[in-house]
């Protein structure tokens, strides 16, 4: 009886020990699993970065390299070489940016670059033309003169003048009758040419249409809009490149004595008129500068409701304009 009791007690103790050992073993296995899981989370940024890099090129990835549902991979790691970070960067940078794109036509060189290119501003230059002399004009045919006038452009000779066309036709007819073996030293027939003005001043007056006077504020605004600068002798000057350091092409003076503009009272004064004048010889081309002064006079007349007069105080019409141009 005592032996049976002892065996029962020993069996119960053994059973309890087995149960306790089983529970303890189970908890230890769970503890190891969670430790590994926590360790994977701590290193997961690197693993996730490799996973994202692998997903960029899915054709080169083995299914064994993915981690599913937070579990560690069961299979052995593959020996396949993953793309390095430098190679991945080169791959991502292989696409050209918009600035590198060039538009071109087939079988031709690129004609336009989409990149941001800043070109230096082109400074305006005063065109210089070689004006033909009177002797050269006399020796030209009408067709040659018209061709040269088209090449010269704005500063060319006005070949539409009836008198000039008649003279050229007569000279051309005479030259065709002369032997072509004549020496260049032989005297040529002199042509009557109007003498050009090379010194002095060319002037244009601008007065109001009515008996009223020009308002100082409006006059100053109109002059400044045309690029005039108040400078030497208290007059407005039109410079070559709109800076006081460049030469003066033509100027504007007040008709009232002493002909100046008070810099400290420009907004309050009135005047009966102004005079535009150009001194010869002028910087650059006299004819081009005279045309520019005429355009400025016409613009001022429109802005200020004025009338342009010649030096003889006559209306500056088309005939007077041609006479002015013929002077230079």
Curated annotation (Swiss-Prot):
PANTHER family reported for this sequence: CELL DIVISION PROTEIN ZIPA (PTHR38685:SF1)
Membrane topology, record value: Single-pass type I membrane protein
Record keyword Lyase present: no
Function as written in the Swiss-Prot or TrEMBL entry: Essential cell division protein that stabilizes the FtsZ protofilaments by cross-linking them and that serves as a cytoplasmic membrane anchor for the Z ring. Also required for the recruitment to the septal ring of downstream cell division proteins.
GO BP: division septum assembly; FtsZ-dependent cytokinesis
Periplasmic-facing ranges: 1-4
Transmembrane annotation, as ranges: 5-25
Region (Disordered): 39-79
SUPFAM superfamilies: Cell-division protein ZipA, C-terminal domain
Protein name in the entry: Cell division protein ZipA
Biased composition (Polar residues): 57-79
Keywords (A to Z) from UniProt: Cell cycle, Cell division, Cell inner membrane, Cell membrane, Membrane, Transmembrane, Transmembrane helix
Gene name as annotated: zipA
Species lineage: Bacteria, Pseudomonadati, Pseudomonadota, Gammaproteobacteria, Pasteurellales
Organism: Haemophilus influenzae (strain 86-028NP)
Major location (coarse): membrane
Cytoplasmic side: 26-328
Description of how the protein assembles with itself and partners: Interacts with FtsZ via their C-terminal domains.
Subcellular location(s) of the protein: Cell inner membrane
InterPro entries assigned: Cell_div_ZipA (IPR011919), ZipA_FtsZ-bd_C (IPR007449), ZipA_FtsZ-bd_C_sf (IPR036765)
GO CC annotation: cell division site; plasma membrane
UniProt similarity note: Belongs to the ZipA family.
Pfam families: ZipA_C
